Structure formats: C-alpha cells, structure tokens
Curated annotation (Swiss-Prot):
Quaternary structure annotation from Swiss-Prot or TrEMBL: Homodimer.
An example Gene Ontology CC term for this record: cytoplasm
Species, as recorded: Brucella suis (strain ATCC 23445 / NCTC 10510)
Subcellular localization: Cytoplasm
GO biological process, one term: protein folding
Keyword annotations of the record: Chaperone, Cytoplasm, Stress response
Region described as Disordered: spans on this chain: 1-24, 209-230
Protein name per Swiss-Prot or TrEMBL: Protein GrpE
Record's function text: Participates actively in the response to hyperosmotic and heat shock by preventing the aggregation of stress-denatured proteins, in association with DnaK and GrpE. It is the nucleotide exchange factor for DnaK and may function as a thermosensor. Unfolded proteins bind initially to DnaJ; upon interaction with the DnaJ-bound protein, DnaK hydrolyzes its bound ATP, resulting in the formation of a stable complex. GrpE releases ADP from DnaK; ATP binding to DnaK triggers the release of the substrate protein, thus completing the reaction cycle.
Encoding gene, per UniProt annotation: grpE
UniProt xrefs under Pfam families: GrpE (PF01025)
Bias-annotated ranges (Polar residues): 221-230
Main localisation: cytoplasm
Length: 230
C-alpha cells in the first residue's frame, strides 16, 4: 500500500522510454509533480496535526480559565458578603454610638436627681405649710428635678414603671419580698429606687420589692396557678 501511494498514478509513464529525450523529460516532469504533490500532502497532514494540537491546547486553556473564573466568582461573592456584613455592623455601631453616647453622663445626672428627690422628701410637710419661703424653695427644687428628667427623656432616657409588673431581672433588682397571697409570685409591689433605661438597654435597674406566697405563673401561657397545684 505504501509503495502504491508513493508511485505516480499515470499509467502512461510505464510506456515511456527513458532513453528517449522526450520521454525522459516527461518522466522527470511527472516525478517533479509527484514530489510536489507528496510534499503538499505532507504539509497538509502536518498542519492538521498542529491544528489538532492547538485545539487541544486551547480546550485545556479554556478549562483552566473557567476554573479560575469560578474561583474568582466565589471570592467576589465572599468579599461582597463580608463588605455587606461590615456595612451593617458599622451602621449598627454608629446607631448605638448615637443612642448611647450620653450613657455615662445620664447615669451621673440620675445621681443628682436622686439627691434632689431625697432633699425634697426630707422636708416635713408641716414645715412646708408653716414656712412660705421653704415651700417656694421646695417647689423650685422639684421643678429643677422635673426639668432634668425631661431633658434626659429627650435624649432617650426613660423612667421604668415596674409596679404591678412581673419581676424582670434585666431591669429590676429585688431588695425584699412581701407576702401577698392575692398576687402572683414575683410581682413588683413596691419601688424603692426608680430605674431608668436608655434605648433598649437598662441604665439603672429599679430597686423593688416583690410579692411571695401567691399563685405561681405558668411558664407556658403566663396563667396563674395556685401553690397547691404547682
């Protein structure tokens, strides 16, 4: 098969006489044409092999680039998620800074308010009735106390009103217990010192007295149950 492929395909050449100059020239021309054709075929085969190799190389490069692209997308999504979390965290920190910036100052002002209230409570009622100047002074101190608390309220400080509510250790500090069979256990029955909150945080817990001996509160639905059924 290889010999047939490498042999010129013109049957007339077999009839040529190599000793005849014309035939010899024809044979030479045929051989040249055959060699040119074989060279062209060889170049075409080499080009085809090279092209096939380039296709394989291109396919490999595409696969590598697709893998790199997938990895870059994952990295981009992670970075975007981290940036979003950072933005939310920063926004929350800024909001907290604005809401709670006066926390320490407000706590100090509550001590001043407590002193004003103690001064007012220390004045006997009959002394106020007997001395108009003392009464005017007392009213002035009371107005100062109210103005201070209103100013704090404008900045997010609110007074807790726990009396009659269920004791909450996050906002209340129990100082004593009061026996009362008519109220559910751990109901705030008396406020010894007012408590305050700033935003959602406790600024100062309310010092309270709580009831004991009454029906317990069910943890499931908040309904009261008697001591005997507990």
């Amino acid at each position: 098969m290889a010999d047939e492929k490498n042999k010129p395909e013109n049957p007339d050449l077999d009839q040529r006489d190599i000793n005849n100059p014309r035939d010899r020239e024809a044979l030479k021309q045929a051989a040249d044409n055959f060699l040119k054709a074989r060279r062209a075929e060889a170049r075409a085969e080499a080009a085809a092999d090279e092209a096939e190799g380039e296709v394989d190389e291109t396919a490999n490069r595409i696969a590598v680039l697709e893998a790199d692209n997938t990895e870059l997308k994952d990295q981009m999504l992670r970075v975007a998620a981290e940036m979003e979390n950072l933005r939310k965290r920063t926004q929350r920190d800024v909001q907290d800074a604005r809401a709670y910036a006066i926390t320490n100052f407000a706590r100090d002002m509550l001590s001043v308010s407590d002193n004003l209230r103690r001064a007012l409570d220390a004045i006997p009622a009959d002394a106020l009735e007997a001395d108009s100047n003392l009464k005017s002074l007392s009213e002035g101190v009371e107005m100062t106390e109210r103005a201070m608390l209103l100013a704090l309220e404008r900045h997010g400080v609110k007074k807790l009103e726990p009396e009659g509510q269920k004791f909450d250790p996050n906002f209340h500090q129990a100082m004593f217990e009061v026996p009362n069979p008519d109220l559910p256990n751990n109901t705030v029955v008396q406020v010894v010192q007012a408590g305050y909150a700033i935003g959602d945080r406790v600024l100062r817990p309310a010092m309270v007295g709580v009831s004991k001996g009454g029906p317990k509160v069910s943890a499931e639905n908040g309904a009261s149950t008697s001591e005997d059924n507990a």
